[in-house]
């Protein structure tokens, strides 16, 4: 799902101009870079940093690529949260994923709880892995 969001925001669609996206792909699960070329379709305005720790990659993207949006999968460490604060304070929007059974489960991680309680996010969407298409907007 994250890859589809990235591709659509990057390419644009009817009445929505594509945005420059910076993808943090620490383990190569989003873009699947091979010899410098994404093997997955992630859009025409997308730059990728792979095989670099997420926190470092986010800072590099902000400083050197000037993306409008940064996308990163599986956040949760203290370093990730500090980097997200840096990204958001730099005026860059973000799309981030975190794994958990529900929002309460995600908030058991003290760093994630801090990020959520500081109202860094404009919107949090909870997906239900047991029932396809079932989602709930927590913050809007």
Segment roles from a protein language model:
Residues 2, 21-26, 71-72:
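Short, conserved beta-strand edge motifs with alternating hydrophobic and charged residues
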Residues 140:
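N-terminal cationic and glycine-rich segments that engage phosphates or anionic surfaces
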Residues 1-11:
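Glycine-rich phosphate-binding P-loop
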Residues 66-67, 71-125, 129:
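Conserved P-loop NTPase nucleotide-binding/switch module
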Residues 2, 31, 78-80:
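Short glycine/serine/threonine-rich phosphate/pyrophosphate-binding segments
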Residues 132:
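Long C-terminal interaction/binding lobes of large macromolecular proteins
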Residues 6, 58-59, 81-84:
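Generic hydrophobic/aromatic pocket-lining and core-packing "Φ" positions
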């Amino acid at each position: 799902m994250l890859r589809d969001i990235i591709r659509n925001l990057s390419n644009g669609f009817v009445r929505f101009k594509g945005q420059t996206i910076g993808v943090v792909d620490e383990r190569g699960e989003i873009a699947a870079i091979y010899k410098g070329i994404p093997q997955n379709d992630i859009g025409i305005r997308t730059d990728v940093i792979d095989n670099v720790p997420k926190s470092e990659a986010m800072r590099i993207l902000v400083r050197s690529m000037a993306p409008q949006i940064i996308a990163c999968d599986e956040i949760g460490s203290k370093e990730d949260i500090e980097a997200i604060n840096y990204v958001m304070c730099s005026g860059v929007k973000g799309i981030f994923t975190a794994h958990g059974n529900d929002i309460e489960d995600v908030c058991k991680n003290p760093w994630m709880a801090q990020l959520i309680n500081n109202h860094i996010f404009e919107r949090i969407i909870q997906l239900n892995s047991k029932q396809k298409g079932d989602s709930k907007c927590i913050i809007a």
